[in-house]
């Protein structure tokens, strides 16, 4: 798939797997994951779950995107996913992208391999 700009849900290209489907949007060193599968919040109802990750493998709480005390947000419609995509562009200051070598480049950056409690964090994008 060629690299493309992602501004709304209908721009996404999903990958199917045994449990459902997933997509990602990369904002420089931040990744927005969008999933719909039998294990995701709302997936059995055809709704989506999103999560945000830094390129070092940390889950990130993002105001207006994830839940305030959780690293994911579930039970989302396509319209709500579009809101999250646009909110991520707004707070990171970059346009989300998908495809090409983006995922390979993102995955090859150093990733922490620690238990989840030790690498979770909340990001204040105003201080970056």
Regions picked out by a protein language model, each given a short descriptive name:
Residues 11-52:
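Amphipathic, interaction-prone secondary-structure segments
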């Amino acid at each position: 798939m060629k690299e493309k700009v992602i501004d709304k849900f209908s721009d996404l290209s999903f990958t199917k797997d045994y449990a459902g489907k997933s997509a990602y949007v990369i904002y420089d060193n931040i990744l927005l994951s969008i999933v719909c599968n039998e294990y995701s919040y709302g997936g059995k109802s055809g709704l989506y779950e999103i999560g945000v990750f830094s390129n070092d493998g940390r889950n990130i709480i993002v105001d207006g995107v994830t839940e305030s005390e959780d690293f994911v947000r579930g039970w989302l419609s396509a319209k709500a996913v579009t809101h999250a995509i646009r909110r991520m562009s707004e707070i990171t200051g970059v346009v989300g992208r998908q495809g090409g070598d983006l995922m390979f480049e993102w995955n090859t950056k150093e990733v922490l391999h620690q238990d989840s409690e030790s690498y979770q964090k909340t990001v204040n994008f105003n201080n970056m």
